[in-house]
Amino acid sequence: MLVLITYDVQTSSMGGTKRLRKVAKACQNYGQRVQNSVFECIVDSTQLTSLKLELTSLIDEEKDSLRIYRLGNNYKTKVEHIGAKPSIDLEDPLIF
């Protein structure tokens, strides 16, 4: 299923900057950054549970915000991209 992860981490303190880097790194382990603080991730339910647990352990719920949108398996008709940074098909093979 495709999930969209968005987050807002307060970075006015040193701890916030560190949390921001850790949240971004955790999201990169599961998906592709599509904008600042926005990731598209193709995950199954077990991976989503693991990702949620990891992210909630990293953020400060008093200062930070995390949103997870489940777009499901039939997401291709629900996502439209306009403008710079062409879309990447997350299900295509990656060639390095």
From Swiss-Prot:
pH dependence: Optimum pH is 7-10.
Transmembrane domains' residue ranges: none
Documented EC number(s): 3.1.-.-
Taxonomy of the source species: Bacteria, Bacillati, Bacillota, Bacilli, Bacillales
Cofactor(s) the protein requires to work: Mg(2+); Mn(2+); Fe(2+); Ni(2+)
A Pfam match: CRISPR_Cas2
Biological process, per Gene Ontology: defense response to virus; maintenance of CRISPR repeat elements
Natural source organism: Halalkalibacterium halodurans (strain ATCC BAA-125 / DSM 18197 / FERM 7344 / JCM 9153 / C-125) (Bacillus halodurans)
InterPro entries: CRISPR_associated_Cas2, Virulence_VapD/CRISPR_Cas2
SUPFAM superfamilies: TTP0101/SSO1404-like (SSF143430)
Regulation: Inhibited by EDTA and Zn(2+). Activated by high concentrations of monovalent cation with a preference for K(+) over Na(+).
GO MF term set: DNA endonuclease activity; magnesium ion binding; protein homodimerization activity; RNA endonuclease activity
Entry similarity comment: Belongs to the CRISPR-associated endoribonuclease Cas2 protein family.
Superkingdom of origin: Bacteria
Note accompanying the cofactor annotation: Binds 1 Mg(2+) per homodimer, shared between the Asp-8 pair; divalent cations support activity in decreasing order, Mg(2+) >> Mn(2+) > Fe(2+) > Ni(2+) > Ca(2+).
Protein name: CRISPR-associated endonuclease Cas2
Residues that hold Mg(2+) according to the record: D8
UniProt keyword Hydrolase, yes or no: yes
Enzyme type, top EC level: hydrolase
Function: CRISPR (clustered regularly interspaced short palindromic repeat), is an adaptive immune system that provides protection against mobile genetic elements (viruses, transposable elements and conjugative plasmids). CRISPR clusters contain sequences complementary to antecedent mobile elements and target invading nucleic acids. CRISPR clusters are transcribed and processed into CRISPR RNA (crRNA). Involved in the integration of spacer DNA into the CRISPR cassette. Functions as a dsDNA-specific endonuclease, acting on circular and linear DNA; has no activity on ssRNA or ssDNA.
Keywords for this protein: Antiviral defense, Endonuclease, Hydrolase, Magnesium, Metal-binding, Nuclease
Oligomer and partners: Homodimer, forms a heterotetramer with a Cas1 homodimer.
HAMAP family on file: Cas2
